[in-house]
């Protein structure tokens, strides 16, 4: 019998503004809807990176409530980007849309250069460059 190590395959978020969240993750993260279904009177949507549909998805479910994190809470979803300029571009876009949370900043390795953005349901999203994570990392 083969024993498999647990592997992270998805994160599920119950959100209040499903369509706005879909649009946000499509616009900021280039995710696309890889699956959608109704579940009773609620909708369930899987958002994926192209080519990773069977590796990792973000599941979004309608009918949730915005739950802003407590003051000083740093929980977030992290996305690696290709350059510091891309971090700056996303931060500028977020500022224009009124959802910039943390302006770009440089931290010592392994944190790198990053900014923070709020999605329409109040989830914190980090865009970073220079971390040893993701397909574009120096360690990959």
Language model feature labels by segment:
Residues 21, 25, 87, 94:
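Hydrophobic pocket/interface hotspot
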Residues 1-4, 7-16, 67-140:
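Vicinal oxygen chelate
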Residues 45-49, 60, 79, 115-117:
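Short beta-strand element of the conserved SAM-dependent methyltransferase core
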Residues 54-62:
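Conserved segment of winged-helix/HTH DNA-binding domains
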Residues 1, 61-67:
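Short beta-strand/turn micro-motifs at beta-sheet edges
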Residues 3, 12-55:
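Core segments of cupin and vicinal oxygen chelate
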Residues 34, 55-56, 102, 125:
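Generic structural signal for well-ordered beta-strand positions
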